[in-house]
Amino acid sequence: MTNNTKTITLNLGPQHPATHGVLRLILEMDGEVVNNADPHIGLLHRGTEKLIEHKTYLQAIPYFDRLDYVSPMCQEHAFALAVESLLECEVPRRAQFIRVLFSELTRILNHTLNIGSQALDIGATTPLLWLFEEREKIMEFYERVSGSRMHSNYFRPGGVAEDLPDGLLEDIDKFIEQFPPKLHDIESLLNENRLWKQRLVDIGVVSQKEAMDWGFSGPMLRGSGIAWDLRKSNPYDVYDEIDFKVPIGKNGDCYDRYFVRMLEMYESIKIIKQCIEKMPKGAVKTDDPKLTPPTRAKMKESMEAMIHHFKLYTEGYDVPAGETYKAVEAPKGEFGVYLYSQGGNRPYRCRIKAPGFAHLQGLDFISKGHLMADVITIIATLDIVFGEIDR
């Protein structure tokens, strides 16, 4: 008696809400079990790297907000660090603390969306509603500091665009006081929930060796038990002055990755608290007039200041020839920017390293042997956003 099995090919996406963007996933299935998962990317490709070659260094910043549009300021941070490395310019301490403060608010912004939408994919509606209420408060902080809720365009090579408005630090302080109890409420719903654990525990297991071999970073790497965090291993701005822990998992499954993200939010709260306590007075931009535009007050008094402002924003500033690679610990993993300058006001080459790109490549081996329903859980726990993958 012969046992002939016939596999079926299933198209998941690119319109399916559980694909978190424009993922087209071709699944080869034996009944309900996944044999192969082939992700098709490129549906959100906009040629960002090529566009940046035709823009000045200041005009390039808004493009980084539109990569991982869930955590925009972390992308800006990497680009600002790369340009500063080529310029060899000093960043005022107040600006460094503001950057770290908003990078950690961005981490909370990212993880609240990820955990909320992951719970929704599995069938739990309440966490999404509660967490979106908290995200709204952070988006208001974004709006108050930059004028925009999502695409902030706030970080600059040499500092930040504007100083914090009056009362903002006090409001952020109030937010981080009331936020931990909300996280405890989410944990009380999910951590020991029988259905949640059945859907996450031992699903999508990634060993330490696999995580290293595939170039994973962020919660995907730390969930497998590897304590690698660029804020600790290669600190930038004032992270070396701040005390925090790097949460890690044990088993490398979906539950561990969820838990790592949960613990990271508590650590972000600690970092934000320290930033508020240590925030110095002073300038928020470098004092080099070639990089920093004149103030509005000066422009109203001086025609030269007006001309300087116009030329800075139309022609930009020249960056010395050279190359650099700078990476930040973005919420999804290591987000890196490689810049190559031949001198002049535009980069010759800008290469963007997106953490989600490596994570999506691993989807095939992670989902092999799992059920179709588990693939939805795995996609959610990868935390992929196609703005940064397709670029």
UniProtKB/Swiss-Prot annotation:
Keywords, alphabetical: Cell inner membrane, Cell membrane, Membrane, NAD, Quinone, Translocase, Transport, Ubiquinone
GO cellular component: plasma membrane
MF GO annotations: NAD binding; NADH:ubiquinone reductase (non-electrogenic) activity; quinone binding
Record bears the keyword ATP-binding: no
SUPFAM superfamilies, A to Z: HydB/Nqo4-like
Primary location: membrane
Membrane association type: Peripheral membrane protein
EC number(s) stated in the UniProt entry for this protein: 7.1.1.-
UniProt key word Glycosyltransferase: no
Catalytic activity line of the entry: a quinone + NADH + 5 H(+)(in) = a quinol + NAD(+) + 4 H(+)(out)
Compartments where found: Cell inner membrane
Gene3D superfamilies named among the record's database cross-references: Cytochrome-c3 Hydrogenase, chain B
Database matches in Pfam families: Complex1_49kDa
PANTHER family: NADH DEHYDROGENASE [UBIQUINONE] IRON-SULFUR PROTEIN 2, MITOCHONDRIAL, NADH-UBIQUINONE OXIDOREDUCTASE 49 KDA SUBUNIT
Role summary: NDH-1 shuttles electrons from NADH, via FMN and iron-sulfur (Fe-S) centers, to quinones in the respiratory chain. The immediate electron acceptor for the enzyme in this species is believed to be ubiquinone. Couples the redox reaction to proton translocation (for every two electrons transferred, four hydrogen ions are translocated across the cytoplasmic membrane), and thus conserves the redox energy in a proton gradient.
Family: Belongs to the complex I 49 kDa subunit family.
Oligomer and partners: NDH-1 is composed of 14 different subunits. Subunits NuoB, C, D, E, F, and G constitute the peripheral sector of the complex.
Name the UniProt record assigns to this protein: NADH-quinone oxidoreductase subunit D
Species annotation: Rickettsia felis (strain ATCC VR-1525 / URRWXCal2)
